[in-house]
Curated annotation (Swiss-Prot):
Annotated Pfam families: Ribosomal_L23
Species of the source: Desulforudis audaxviator (strain MP104C)
Keyword set, alphabetical order: Ribonucleoprotein, Ribosomal protein, RNA-binding, rRNA-binding
Family: Belongs to the universal ribosomal protein uL23 family.
Name under which the protein is recorded: Large ribosomal subunit protein uL23
Listed Gene3D superfamilies: 3.30.70.330
UniProt GO MF annotations: rRNA binding; structural constituent of ribosome
Role: One of the early assembly proteins it binds 23S rRNA. One of the proteins that surrounds the polypeptide exit tunnel on the outside of the ribosome. Forms the main docking site for trigger factor binding to the ribosome.
Keyword RNA-binding set for record: yes
Amino acid sequence: MKFAHDILRKPLISEKSMSLTEGNKYTFIVDPRANKTEIKKAVEEIFKVKVLKVNTIRVKGKQVRRRNILGRKPETKKAVVTLRPGDKIEIFEGV
């Protein structure tokens, strides 16, 4: 079993994700191996809120080049978490 803090890596703060907070949706960067039920349990455990829905997006790593050497940035996974009306996550409030 994975720990909740291993599944949720960090909150995603962007213009689009901040506009989603008005609709009670919060965006996180999560472990690429985590599934929706693990993400739901982790958010409920850490922030003490009720999650209604979890949508996930897999972001492919971009190709990077340093002189003649080609490489790739790692793939990431985003999760958009919809909360019950009335619930809030405080880390998104002051931004």
